[in-house]
């Protein structure tokens, strides 16, 4: 009864008004699974290919009708009749059908839409919530959220090069408390921006995008907002950065417009260390360019024992590239973005590889999102203990937070909120 009888994709819009792929998978039992694919703004060079039409007369070339056609034709023909519980087998069929390293023929947006919709259909058919279907019956942790309250870089139109300034409510006793803490700080920050004459418009991920003079000024604003909301920075709340360094790395230097200077990789590592020494920063994502492995090694040697160093553009959720990073001893955490690799099975393989080598994993959204909340279930299913899914505004971000509230409610006494223990690779 769990055999796939129909697969149908359509073109929908994401949170930036750009087209993306949504897929419905129908089973013999009458159950349907639906999933929609996210899209990134700052993307790693080695990410799986997001297939766009290139027809400038539609959506400025960003249409996804080709990817939709691939789902409705080649992929559907290959998968109809197969048991939806055979997730790995289904994903492998799509990988082989595509035949490239980067999903360049079918498009990762096509394969991922099907992969996630199959999992949702199979979970529904099994009578299980998605997080239980994927994660099994063992104990589960709710993730500590990284909440993006100040946006810069590719996510905002201001002079800040560092892309995301985030708060992490590590002192909370539950996810519900953590969410309240983040929301209260977010609203305190809005009042603070208002009082200083900064605009309170928000960026792609829901954070504020004030035109500040330096990155330190952004961090100081976060300290003030945390205290104004009644919490202690460094105790109740820790900070996290996503530098997205590849976006300002050029000709062997890191160019910070807000600071008015350029840095070698050694100098930039020292700059980041100075921020860590001055502010309660526990996590830095993409602190070096994705191809600057020497810089990554320097940064890991300098900060890897006390700060979580997350590889996003560096690893692109690819088990092969992650294995290389582990061997070279760079970074100590993996950012997990399902559309960087293009199937659920490969995503889970990357998380498992990270875990076995004492690298933390951070489940992540993209800047172009939909109401799909699959990553909330994935964060719990994998027990990765951290999630990055934007600020405390925009419905596309709230969909994930609200789903985590529901999951915590369902788990009841069995729900664990790890707090600082989420940084187990640091011995926290």
Curated annotation (Swiss-Prot):
Reaction(s) catalysed by this chain's protein: (2R)-2-phosphoglycerate = phosphoenolpyruvate + H2O
Molecular-function annotations in GO: magnesium ion binding; phosphopyruvate hydratase activity
Active site feature: 205 (proton donor), 337 (proton acceptor)
Cofactor binding comment, as recorded: Binds a second Mg(2+) ion via substrate during catalysis.
Gene Ontology terms describing biological process: glycolytic process
Cofactor: Mg(2+)
Function field: Catalyzes the reversible conversion of 2-phosphoglycerate (2-PG) into phosphoenolpyruvate (PEP). It is essential for the degradation of carbohydrates via glycolysis.
Family named by the database record: Belongs to the enolase family.
The protein's name: Enolase
């Amino acid at each position: 009864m769990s055999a796939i009888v129909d697969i149908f994709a359509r073109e929908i819009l994401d949170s930036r008004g750009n087209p993306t792929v949504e897929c419905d998978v129908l089973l013999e039992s009458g159950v349907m699974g639906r999933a929609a694919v996210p899209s990134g703004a700052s993307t790693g060079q080695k990410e799986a290919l997001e297939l766009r039409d290139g027809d400038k007369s539609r959506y400025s070339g960003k249409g996804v009708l080709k990817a939709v056609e691939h789902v409705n034709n080649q992929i559907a023909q290959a998968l109809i009749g197969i048991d939806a519980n055979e997730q790995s087998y289904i994903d492998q069929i799509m990988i082989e059908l595509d035949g490239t390293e980067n999903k360049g023929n079918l498009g990762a947006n096509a394969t991922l839409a099907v992969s996630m919709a199959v999992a949702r259909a199979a979970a529904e058919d099994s009578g299980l919530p998605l997080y239980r279907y994927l994660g099994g019956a063992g104990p589960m942790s709710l993730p500590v959220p990284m909440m993006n309250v100040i946006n810069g870089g590719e996510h905002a139109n201001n002079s800040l090069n560092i892309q995301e300034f985030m708060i992490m409510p590590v002192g909370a006793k539950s996810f519900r408390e953590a969410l309240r803490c983040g929301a209260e700080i977010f609203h305190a920050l809005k009042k603070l921006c208002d009082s200083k004459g900064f605009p309170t418009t928000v960026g792609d991920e829901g954070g504020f995008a004030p035109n500040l003079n330096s990155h330190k000024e952004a961090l100081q604003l976060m300290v003030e907002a945390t205290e104004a909301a009644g919490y202690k920075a460094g105790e109740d709340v820790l900070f996290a950065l996503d530098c997205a360094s590849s976006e300002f790395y050029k000709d062997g230097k890191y160019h910070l417009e807000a600071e008015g200077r350029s840095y070698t990789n050694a100098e930039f590592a020292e700059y980041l260390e100075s921020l860590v020494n001055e502010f309660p920063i526990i996590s830095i994502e993409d602190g070096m360019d994705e191809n600057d492995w020497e810089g990554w090694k320097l940064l890991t040697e300098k900060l890897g024992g006390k700060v979580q160093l997350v590889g996003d553009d560096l690893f692109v959720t690819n088990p092969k590239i992650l294995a290389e990073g582990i061997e070279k001893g760079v970074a100590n955490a993996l950012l997990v973005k399902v559309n960087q690799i293009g199937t659920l099975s490969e995503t889970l393989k990357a998380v498992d590889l990270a875990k076995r080598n004492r690298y933390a994993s951070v489940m992540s959204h993209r800047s172009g999102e939909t109401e799909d909340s699959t990553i909330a279930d994935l964060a719990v299913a994998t027990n990765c203990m951290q999630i990055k899914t934007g600020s405390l505004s925009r419905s596309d971000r709230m969909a994930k937070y609200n789903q985590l509230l529901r999951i915590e409610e369902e788990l009841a006494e069995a729900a664990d909120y790890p707090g600082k223990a989420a940084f187990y690779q640091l011995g926290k």
